[in-house]
Design a protein with these regions (language model features):
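Hydrophobic helical membrane-anchoring modules
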Residues: 1-3, 144, 149-152, 175-249
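Acidic donor-diphosphate engagement hotspot in glycosyltransferases and nucleotidyltransferases
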Residues: 19, 47, 76, 100-102, ...
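Donor nucleotide-sugar binding loop of glycosyltransferases
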Residues: 12-15, 43, 72, 98
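Short, well-formed alpha-helical segments that are part of the catalytic scaffolds
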Residues: 12-27
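Acceptor/aglycone-binding surface of glycosyltransferases and processive sugar-polymer synthases
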Residues: 66-82, 87, 99-181, 207-217, ...
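A conserved acidic beta->alpha catalytic loop
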Residues: 40-49, 95
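Conserved donor nucleotide-binding strand/loop of the catalytic core
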Residues: 34-37, 48-82
Length: 249
């Protein structure tokens, strides 16, 4: 079994080193045949150069660069469509969920599901540091909107810790349209329409103050994205087959 870890990164030069060090340490400890794909989303700092430095020293690290700043959803799609592993997992650059939680998702996939998504709310006691109350409130409201408009009944669609069988990723991500924060419910909606099996798995998680999600601006965009998902479904955008194609730089 081979593994691909996708890490979307935007202006992460201050914290990408400890993240890569921990991922290298843990994957070696587990003796995994694994690659780490860091997708630089047009960073204005030296994120890309730091990753190149690591890639020169560690053959399992690869750098992908987006054509400018396109958003987290674009970065995840780009990484997934370049991934070579049998199981592909994307994780946030701050490792809000420790990489040591990955075996929980891998075990769910080995048990027969196509996609395993980390959840902060199936067992809330696993949150070692919670979000501010206003962000928790927004999350609950957004979750209700997803239930009403998209029929997604997961307790947590937004945790940035999700694993896919490669075959499932190659079916879902070519159809993804949303490039920024609202992509998570879109890929889950597409997966459900395809009849793919999705498991929600409780994971350790800690809030990071360095998050780049703007609660009002990006929150409003995410609600608009839900309407876009409904429109895309209505117009058949998620029905036509699409050939896997990734953006390279």
């Amino acid at each position: 079994m081979t593994y691909s870890f996708i890490v979307p990164a935007y202006n992460e030069s201050s914290r990408i080193r400890p993240t890569l060090n921990e991922m290298l340490r843990y994957t070696a400890e587990q003796n995994w045949d694994a690659e780490i794909l860091v997708v630089d989303d047009g960073s204005r700092d030296d994120t890309a150069e730091v990753i190149r430095e690591y890639a020169r020293a560690h053959s399992q690290i690869r750098l992908l660069q987006n054509p400018g700043n396109r958003g987290k959803g674009f970065s995840v799609r780009n990484g997934m469509l370049h991934a070579r592993g049998d199981i592909c997992l994307f994780t946030d650059a701050d490792l809000s969920s420790p990489i040591s939680e990955a075996p929980k998702l891998f075990e769910a996939i080995r048990s027969g599901v196509d996609i395993a998504i980390g959840s902060r709310w199936l067992r809330a006691e696993l949150q070692t540091e919670r979000q501010p109350l206003y962000r928790q409130a927004f999350g609950r409201i957004f979750n209700l909107v997803l239930r009403l408009f998209l029929g997604l009944t997961f307790k947590d669609t937004q945790c940035g810790f999700k694993a896919f069988r490669r075959a499932a990723a190659q079916r879902v991500f070519p159809l993804q349209k949303i490039e920024r924060w609202g992509f998570d419910p879109e890929i889950l909606y597409i997966a459900r329409r395809m009849g793919l099996k999705v498991a929600e798995v409780p994971v350790l998680w800690a809030h990071s103050e360095g998050t780049r999600l703007h609660p009002f601006r990006d929150g409003m965009r995410m609600f608009v994205d839900v309407l876009h998902i409904r429109w895309n479904a209505f117009t058949g955008a998620y029905s036509a087959p699409a050939a896997p194609a990734a953006d390279r730089m």
